[in-house]
Amino acid sequence: MRKKNIILAGALTLMAAAISACAPAGSNSNKKGLEAYQNGDYQNAVYLFKQAITQEPSEDAYYCNLGQAYCAQGYYEEAIESFTQALNLGGSSFYSYRGMGLAYNGLEEYEKAIESFQQAIEAAGSLDSSCRLDVVGYRAEAKMKLGDYEGSLEDYNELIEAGYRLRDIYQLTGNVYLLMDDVDQALHCYQECLDIDNRNYEGYLTLSLIHISEPTRR
């Protein structure tokens, strides 16, 4: 299996198989698919990844990339099938389970999403710590949507302790506290968010709305 040239594309991570000067046709189609994905041309990306699979059906990375492209279009069931095929071919458990979690999240099947994210976290191994923390954030979001606010806070606090994307994480943590009707903790989190970036419009807007609804807290 080839797992070089990891390409970040928005919220999703696409795996690119190693491409050499004498690369086979599948690799060329895969490369074009990655370029299409990065340009937001997801429909063409799907076509190109399928073409790469036809040319090299045993290359697991192509199935993983296809799953990501399906996810980007909202075709979550097709994405899950592609990620499952990548796993069956011995593909990267981390990227496949991460993608499956995102797909289940899109289907609002949050328990399955959390399970997939957990499997991705366990498979992170020696990958850069930001890869694992990224998935912890997705798991926190899924727990919040499931109504497991305590579990969501546990994940977000782990990210805060790690110093990971603090502005965004404080904002999201404040949102969870609001759902729990803990206005004081929510205000604390939003203030932390603004202390990091005083240009954060969302943070100011949320604080303003809280003060409007809770005038005695001024």
PLM region descriptions:
Residues K31, N65-Q68, A72, G99, ...:
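Canonical tetratricopeptide repeat
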Residues L207-R218:
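Residue-level detector of conserved catalytic or cofactor/ligand-binding positions
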